[in-house]
């Protein structure tokens, strides 16, 4: 049987509506949604090698800058040596494993092994990063080829192709300054002036390098560097670097805002003064149908007490499903919500009922001190707790009061176009919410405690009550046992008594029966004598009477 399309749509729409968050009922208890965004997850990253050439090519001004270059090399050594020693300490203890096949002459690469005995103490993160470091390291031949290429180049950004067709980007942050300013000014400036200018520039560049790699001195193996921080060492032009790296993803801005592009140190050359980095720039995958909602709450008054509804700050919806959302590994951008891992996890059925419109399922807690929002702007309307803050109509100068039977006040242009609340002047729009929410028209959820001290106190009281209840239960069990024992004993006594009475009764009845039988026999003997009387001469009437 075919179902008409209109009937099918009519049947489907209610199901879809119940699966969404009921913003209307939530707004009655002070919960509103401030934003909604798509959900994207970071997928597998692509890697690109980048070389920071710390020593610029100064062939054209070498005679005037020997002193400054010597001091600059000494400063670089204080940064590079600790990093190089830490990298060597773990990479020299990681060796490849060769797996033998059936033929002894053929072996294949199977993985790497960490010499733990030689390494000593290392955390799990350091071990994992060390193995990844070993896999991304260049061999000695590639290092020598890279050194030769860096010596000859005098460009700020240089693309160096290795024998395996791998492109390595070499960057020098001071080279443009030398090429464009110092070299053309050699004829107008003295040699001392050129040296001083280069010295100041190198000192500033060293400061940027120190601020960039300084945090990595403690743990250079597992430390990560953001591309934003790296841009200072690359001359400040981050767009030029990203274009040279070949990244042209549509989510570039979102990845930059979420700091998704990371760099790790893979090699340090103390003699040639350069650092090799492995840059990972990920791609994003949008999870279709998942919407992340941000929630904000406004306090409301019940009599003299101020409450607010306890809901998570972020939730996610996908069709009928509503789930919690962990915003810790996420970045929020205009392009959407970007997470480095799955941030969705199940929500309790009671909280789901709350979001679907059952206000009695929404827990509430008392406002402590001045913490908590007392007004918020949503859909152009001002939702305010005018019982706790001063609400004033700026247009008329009158005070907007909130009756005791109201928990919130909704102010729109039909009531007051310009509102002053808590010292802030706000122009509101046309009405989107009812003018007020009355206490008798809404079911409120159970009160709970969120403060650590209050939670501890409540738990202590609950434990005390449980102990008392346990003692009372033990006492009641003892009483029941005694009552049960007493009832059994009394019943036995009663049965024995009844039995004795029955036996005595039977004996008495038996004796009575025997006595009655004896009496009846005696009377029979009296009434029937052995000799008959002489009735001779007696009249017939007398005899007949006898």
Curated annotation (Swiss-Prot):
Mode of membrane association: Single-pass type I membrane protein; Single-pass membrane protein
Region annotation Fusion peptide: where it falls in the sequence: 109-133
Subcellular location(s) of the protein: Virion membrane; Host cell membrane
TM segment ranges: 492-512
Gene3D superfamilies: 1.10.287.2480, 6.10.10.110, Head and neck region of the ectodomain of NDV fusion glycoprotein, Newcastle disease virus like domain
PTM annotation, UniProt: The inactive precursor F0 is glycosylated and proteolytically cleaved into F1 and F2 to be functionally active. The cleavage is mediated by cellular proteases during the transport and maturation of the polypeptide.
Glycosylation sites: 25, 57, 63
Cystine crosslinks: 354-362, 386-391, 393-416
Coiled coil: 134-162, 458-483
Chaperone is among the record's keywords: no
Record topology, Extracellular segments: 20-491
GO biological process, one term: fusion of virus membrane with host plasma membrane
Keyword annotations of the record: Cleavage on pair of basic residues, Coiled coil, Disulfide bond, Fusion of virus membrane with host cell membrane, Fusion of virus membrane with host membrane, Glycoprotein, Host cell membrane, Host membrane, Membrane, Signal, Transmembrane, Transmembrane helix, Viral envelope protein, Viral penetration into host cytoplasm, Virion, Virus entry into host cell
Residues in compartment: Cytoplasmic: 513-546
Residues flagged as site, Cleavage: 108-109
GO cellular component: host cell plasma membrane; membrane; viral envelope; virion membrane
Signal peptide stretch: 1-19
Family: Belongs to the paramyxoviruses fusion glycoprotein family.
Known function: Class I viral fusion protein. Under the current model, the protein has at least 3 conformational states: pre-fusion native state, pre-hairpin intermediate state, and post-fusion hairpin state. During viral and plasma cell membrane fusion, the heptad repeat (HR) regions assume a trimer-of-hairpins structure, positioning the fusion peptide in close proximity to the C-terminal region of the ectodomain. The formation of this structure appears to drive apposition and subsequent fusion of viral and plasma cell membranes.
Oligomer status and interactors: Homotrimer of disulfide-linked F1-F2.
The protein, known as: Fusion glycoprotein F0
Annotated organism of origin: Rinderpest virus (strain RBT1) (RDV)
